[in-house]
Structure formats: structure tokens, C-alpha cells
Amino acid sequence: MSLIQSFKLVLSPPHRAATPFLLAGSLVGLLGRATPWRPTRLLGNAGIAFTAFCLYFFRDPKRVPPPRADLVLASADGRVTSVALVTPPAALEMGHTPVWRVSTFLSVLNVHINRMPAAGEVTKIAYHAGKFLNASFDKASEHNERNELRLTLPDGRNIGVVQIAGLIARRILCFVEEGDRVEAGERFGLIRFGSRTDVYLPPGVEPLVVEGQTMVGGETVLAKL
């Protein structure tokens, strides 16, 4: 990535989900800095710093998905922490045959917008309240707060996508509903302050990524259908 591209990424406008945090931080910053009392001014400085952090955390850069319908794309920015054959989540009703699951861990420094891995129809959404274990742990997929989606492709095959809250993340946002038709790379959700996203590939589809690889949501190719 060039220096100019890096600056464009950092300076990307924030997602609308940042609005309440930006307003709160700005208000604390302005009111705190407007008083001569030192403790209040320190609080104001903290408000300004928090606002700057939220501008960075909620950045929403433009992504350009590959113009091909036979690809599965990354659903999140971050680092691949696991590529494993597992049984899909029962709530998604994708059968009991083990499929490849690609887990991507998002640190607080990554872009946290979740994107659709392919074009299709959202045919199932299942939310589960749970714990807030470190999202990089494998057991987080079963015990943490999570939101599971089933995406049905035009050919009838299914892809599972799971948003998993982490140690710091306490709020999963999902912008789609069952019955929605979506495009590859389309924004569908966000997880605040550190998280993980799992993608379950259709049976017989092999992943093209490895553990430790850096992902770019909506652009990196996970697999070929």
C-alpha cells in the first residue's frame, strides 16, 4: 500500500454509526476546554482524544469488489486466525457436513465494517446473546455474543457469515434483514471495538487463504465457487 493510499484509508469519512460517539466526545471536549478549572480541562482533552479515536475507528473506506460472480470475498478487514473444517452453526440450517470456516480477527486498529462475501439473498439471521471472550479464541464462535447470517447464492448454495463480539466489543450492528437481496462487497454490519468475523464456505469449496494472512473486506478473495 502506498503512502497516499494509507492517508486515504485513515482519512476516510466515518460510518453513520459513529454519530452518537462523535457528538458525545465533541460535547465533552468543547465544554471541558471552555472552563479554566484544570480537572475539567483534562476531561475536555480526553473528550477530544476520544472523538479523534472514533473518527479513526469508524472510518468507512470505499472498496471495489472484483467484477466476478464466482468468487467469495472477505467479509472483514483483519488477520486470518483460523482456517478449519467445522460443522456450520445449527441455527443457520446449513446441514451437518463439515465445511471450511475462515475466521478473521479484527483489532481496534482495523476497519470494522462487515461486507457481504457474495451476491445473493439473506435467508436466515440468528442472534445469540453470550459472553465476551477474546474473539481470537476458537471457542468464541460458540460462547460469545454473535449474529449469524445465511446467504443463499443464485445457484442455491449457501454461505454462512457470523459476526462475533470480542473482549472489548459489546455491540453488534446488522443492517440487513431476512429476504434482502445483496451484492458482493455490500456493507451489512459493524461490530464496535474489536471483534471477529467467520465465513462458512459451501460444501466442496476450498479456501484460497491461509492463517496469518491480512484481509481487506470486500476485496480479498477467500475462495472460488
UniProtKB/Swiss-Prot annotation:
Write down the chemical reaction(s) this protein catalyses: a 1,2-diacyl-sn-glycero-3-phospho-L-serine + H(+) = a 1,2-diacyl-sn-glycero-3-phosphoethanolamine + CO2
Statement: the UniProt record of this protein carries the keyword Zinc: no
UniProt PTM:
Is synthesized initially as an inactive proenzyme. Formation of the active enzyme involves a self-maturation process in which the active site pyruvoyl group is generated from an internal serine residue via an autocatalytic post-translational modification. Two non-identical subunits are generated from the proenzyme in this reaction, and the pyruvate is formed at the N-terminus of the alpha chain, which is derived from the carboxyl end of the proenzyme.
Where is this protein found?
A: Cell membrane
According to UniProt, where does the site described as Cleavage (non-hydrolytic) lie?
A: 194-195
Cofactor: how bound: Binds 1 pyruvoyl group covalently per subunit.
Which UniProt keywords are given for this protein, alphabetically ordered? Cell membrane, Decarboxylase, Lipid biosynthesis, Lipid metabolism, Lyase, Membrane, Phospholipid biosynthesis, Phospholipid metabolism, Pyruvate, Zymogen
Entry's Gene Ontology cellular component terms: plasma membrane
InterPro entries, sorted: PS_Dcarbxylase, PSD-A
Respond yes or no to whether keyword Cell membrane is given for this record.
Answer: yes
GO MF terms on file? Answer: phosphatidylserine decarboxylase activity
Q: Which residues carry this modification: Pyruvic acid (Ser)?
A: 195
Q: Which Enzyme Commission number(s) are on file for it? A: 4.1.1.65
Enzyme class name: lyase
Q: Kindly list the cofactors needed.
A: pyruvate
Pathway assigned to this chain's UniProt record: Phospholipid metabolism; phosphatidylethanolamine biosynthesis; phosphatidylethanolamine from CDP-diacylglycerol: step 2/2
Q: What is the topology of this protein in the membrane according to its UniProt annotation?
A: Peripheral membrane protein
Quaternary organization: Heterodimer of a large membrane-associated beta subunit and a small pyruvoyl-containing alpha subunit.
* Function field: Catalyzes the formation of phosphatidylethanolamine (PtdEtn) from phosphatidylserine (PtdSer).
Which family does the entry's similarity section mention? Belongs to the phosphatidylserine decarboxylase family. PSD-A subfamily.
This protein's name: Phosphatidylserine decarboxylase proenzyme
